[in-house]
Amino acid sequence: MGKLTLDITMSLDGFIAGPNQTMEQPLGEGGERIHEWVYGLKSWRESHGESGGEATADDEVFAETFSSTGAVVMGRRMFSGGAGAWEDDPNADGWWGDNPPFGVPVFILTHHAREPVTKEGGTTFTFVTEGAGGALAQARAAAGDKNVAVAGGANVVQQYLGLIDEMQIHIAPLLLGDGVRLFGGPERPVLEATRVIESPAVTHIRYRVVK
C-alpha cells in the first residue's frame, strides 16, 4: 500500500486561493498567480494532452508526483465549485475539461450522490457520500501500491491531516494577504523536512509527517 500524500501549492503567506471566490473566479482574486509556475512545464502540458513545455527541475518534481500517484481525493468545490443538488450546479461535470490532468481515479467528497463521470485520459470521477473515511478506502483500493493524493480544498485537507504520511508544499513567491488558508484547523502534526528544491518560480518542500 502506498502513502497518503498532500501535494499542493500555496502563497508565501499560507493561502491556496485568494479572497472572493466565485464560479467565474474559483481561485479567488489573485489565486491563479499561485499556480503560474506549473503551466509551462512539459509534464503539465503532457497531462493535458498538449506538446511542448519546459523540462526544468520544477518539471521533474511535477512528473515525479504524477507518476507515483494512483488515485486522488478532492472536495466538491474543487471539482466543480458548486454545492447542493447536482441539477442546480452549472458545472455538474466539473471544470476540468474533457481530458483532466489526473489520469487516475478521482474520488469526490460530496453530500449528493450521483453516477461516476468518465473522462478522457484515464480519469474517472467517483462521488462518495460516505465521508472522508469512505473516500479514502475507495481511493486506496483503486491506487494499489501507488500513493493516494489529497488534492484539496483546505477543508478536505483538514479532514485528512491526521492521516497524511507525507506533504509536498510548493511555495509560490508571492503574498495574497487574504483568502483561503491551507492550515487553520486544530490539527498540529509534527513535520520533518526531507527535501528542498528551489527555483526562481517556486520552492518545493517535502515533509515527512512524524507519527
Where are these regions (language model features)?
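Enzymes that bind and transform nitrogen-containing heteroaromatic metabolites
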Residues: 1-211
